Structure formats: structure tokens, C-alpha cells
């Protein structure tokens, strides 16, 4: 009895095969499913069922569970789209005051899915970190990832690089971000006035220098007593000056230097303005008159 039809059922689609007299086999050219087979089952394949029917209506069926042909009836389809990587912290050119920042990123793949074992981070020229050192939280289509360096990063510029691949072996385009660590506040030297200065001149000029090698430029403010903190111009060499008018009595001058990372240094100077001359209240010469060549005592009472 002759074979009537041979059909293949793959991923819910039935295709009738055509007899090839040359190869003496039933054949068909079929378009593979548009998605990866990785998540279809534990074996990561699409099962294929072959159904052969003869002219008498007898039917033979073979599928992926068949002891002899089962392994031949497993269609594995691999996608070609790589995962997407998004670094969420730190951002490019960020200034960070924490030298052990929690670096965060996301890896997603909407087909075969992200292979968590391929997720890695490299800091500067160090070794790539993978595995359990990275905290991976499952989200739709991938993972939210966090990594905190075990050793504090030095102040200055750093570059992180993130790698990943999907379950079909497609490697994502490496993503990188460069940022700066700044744990040290700016230097601040107030050269004038000296602390504790007593003067009879109301005009007072505050001068000094500031610097921050990691996160320039540095801004400087000067405040007199309870007044407003006023910004002053800082030169390319870090020098600054600010003219003030003192009030009579004790004056507190507060100078604050702040770098681009928000870290600040404060210097305070106390200056006293005294414009009242001392008063000579009494003078006594004892004895008076005094014998020539003898000593006498002069006593002066002065207040200020």
C-alpha cells in the first residue's frame, strides 16, 4: 500500500511534505518560528511531530518523545537580537562623594532572555566581576543589577564597563560610563585678615586661595556677621578677595569654599573694630616737687 501524505507539525503549524523522487524522501522547506525556542520547554526546543498516512488510512505518528527518533524531532531556533544594557547609576560625568558607590544597571532581552551568568562589570583596568558578587533581581525580560566595589575607589576619574549576553549566545554591545569620585573637600587658606585682629579701620579686605584637584571649579562665599553669604570671583590660580565694611565691636567673617561635588571647607575669622581713642582720666606725680636727682613715680589712669 502506498503512502498518501506525510505531514510535519511544528509550533502549531502543519506542513504537508512533498515526495522527492531523487532523494526518495518527503521534504519541505519551512520558515522557522520567529522567536527563540529557548523558553519553549526545559530542553529549549520546539517539538516536531511527523504524521504519515497511507492510502488505506493507516496513520503512524512520531514525535520528540520517541525512543529512536525523538532527538531528531527537536527543532532549536536561535534569535539574533542581542540584549540591551542601560546603566542607571552613576550617570556620565557624575561627581560622587561616596568612594564605594552602589553601581546600578539593567539588562533586558525580550526573546531568549538574559543569561545571568554572562552579566559582568569591569572597573577601570581591573578584572571583570561576575557571578554572585553582582546582585541580580529578576524583572520582566531581564535583570536589575547592583554592584558595590569591595575596595574603596580612589579620588579621581573612573570608568565602568558592563557586558552581558542572552541565552542564545548573542553578546550585548558593551556599555560604559565615566565618572569621578571626590571625597576630599577643597583646600581653603584665608591670608587676610588674621584671626583676632583689632583695627581702627572699618574697611577690611578678605583675601585667600582655594583649590580642588578633583572637582574644580570651586565657588567661594564670604559672609559678615549675620548678613548674606556673597559669592566672590575666584581666579584661575584659586585666589580671591572681598572688600567688607566692619561694624563697631566684634565681627565674624565666614568664608566657605565649595567644590563641584558639593563638599565644602569653612574658615572663620574674628576681627574687632575699635575707633574710640583711649581716655586719660588722671595723672599723678609722686612726690611733686621732687629733689633734683631723686626718683619719682608717675601714675596715669587710662580707660578704653
Segments (PLM) and residue ranges:
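Extracellular acidic loop/turn motifs
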Residues: 1-4, 109-116, 211-220, 304
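Short, solvent-exposed loop/linker segments at the N-terminal edge
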Residues: 93-99, 195-202, 288-294
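Surface-exposed, short loops/turns at beta-strand junctions within beta-sandwich domains
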Residues: 32-45, 150-156, 243-250
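Aromatic sugar-binding surface patches on proteins
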Residues: 21-34, 137-147, 236-241
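Flexible, low-complexity linkers/stalks enriched in Thr/Pro that connect modular domains
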Residues: 54, 66-86, 176-186, 269-278
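Short, surface-exposed loop motifs enriched in S/T, G, D/E and P with embedded aromatic residues
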Residues: 12-22, 32, 130-136, 229-236
